[in-house]
A protein has these predicted regions:
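Catalytic domains of carbohydrate-active enzymes, especially glycoside hydrolases
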Residues: 1-11, 242-247
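Residues at or immediately flanking beta-strands
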Residues: 2, 167-171, 296
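Glycine-rich, histidine-containing beta strand-loop boundary motifs that form or position
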Residues: 4-9, 172-174, 253-254, 301
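Alpha-amylase-like alpha-glycosidases and glucanotransferases acting on alpha-linked glucans and related
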Residues: 14-153, 178-320
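Conserved, well-ordered alpha-helix/loop/beta-strand core segments that scaffold catalytic motifs
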Residues: 145-178
Length: 320
């Protein structure tokens, strides 16, 4: 039995799981407040009376954003006052992404949520002295955002263990692209097609077809595949390794983009003026298999599928 889910990342404006602030972080909206109360991190009266303004068939994400973090602040304050025995180990195991994510979120809060590209130039360019000063200034906020991730992942791994014990495997979803307003782009600009001002030169989407005369303009920054190839695809290996710790099976979204990807000049209002560029092909997945071994992957091969895309799916060995 399988349970297929959407991406778990923290959602940004528009509330799409395919536009996340981080490819490694979990969404705080999924943290179960009743479980926090059972753990002694909340009192029921601290959240039971809150009107989340939702109905059984509709979530009010605006209300969640406005009201949930105040509750999580109380839980995290108690957690940080007496950290669990495994907390230091959690921080150590996630040190490759968590400190940058927590700093990014603290800085977003300090800048009223605006995109990182609108921050002061030293912060945009991650000048070491400026980052050190920010880490000191926002230390309490950084601690909060790290603690939130501990709560999310503790509950998630308990949920996955329960599902697996019932004979249920979880199919997770990995978006091919990350959001422009994400810690992934801010912390690793060299991995994306950005200009000297850290602005995308080309963005992602799909060409016009029978369903859409203008195509689809997703707007995500595109990868510098030459850089990823030169670095042995380490970022991708880390990203996929993280996914396989969360899920039993990983569905890779827009798999055809690894064969060829659609590139649209930044600033366009539609996808009409885009063109196809060559992706990394099977080389990426061979490097991933060398590093991680064989894993259960599903290749989402919808959309404009060519013989070349079919060959890549066949070479990879992944079911489509």
């Amino acid at each position: 039995t399988y349970w297929q889910i959407l991406p778990l990342g923290p959602t940004s404006y528009g509330d799409s799981p395919y536009q996340s602030f981080s490819t490694f972080a979990g969404n705080p909206y999924f943290i179960d407040l009743d479980l926090l109360a059972k753990a002694g991190l909340l009192q029921p009266e601290e959240y039971e009376s809150i009107d989340w303004e939702s109905t059984p068939g509709c979530v009010n994400y605006g209300a969640l954003y406005q009201k949930r973090y105040a509750v999580l602040h109380k839980a995290c304050a108690r957690l940080l006052a007496a950290p669990p025995a495994d907390y230091a180990d959690f921080l150590a195991k996630n040190a490759f992404w968590l400190p940058d994510y927590a700093l990014f979120m603290a800085l977003k809060d300090a800048h009223n949520g605006v995109c990182w590209q609108q921050w002061e130039e030293p912060l945009r360019r991650r000048e070491p002295e400026t980052l050190a000063a920010a880490r000191a200034k926002y230390a309490a906020d950084i601690d909060f955002w790290q603690a939130v991730q501990y709560l999310f992942y503790t509950q998630w791994h308990d949920l996955k263990a329960y599902a697996n014990a019932q004979g249920i495997e979880i199919i997770g979803d990995l978006p091919i692209y990350v959001a422009e307003d994400s810690v992934d782009v801010w912390s690793c600009p060299q991995e994306f097609q950005l200009d000297e001002n850290l602005v995308p030169t080309e963005v992602a989407g799909c060409p016009p077809d029978g369903f859409s005369a203008d195509g689809q303009l997703w707007g995500n920054p595109l990868y510098r595949w030459d850089y990823h190839r030169e670095t042995g695809y380490q970022w991708w290996i880390s990203r996929l390794a993280h996914c396989f710790r969360l899920y039993d099976v990983v569905r890779i979204d827009h798999f055809r983009g690894f064969d060829e990807y659609y590139s649209i000049p930044y600033g366009e209002n539609s996808a009409v003026n885009g063109h196809w560029e060559k992706g990394p092909g099977i080389d990426l997945f061979r490097k991933v298999e060398q590093a991680l071994g064989w894993k259960q992957v599903i290749a989402e091969d919808l959309g404009y599928v060519t013989d070349s895309v079919r060959r890549l799916v066949q070479e990879s060995g992944f079911p489509g």
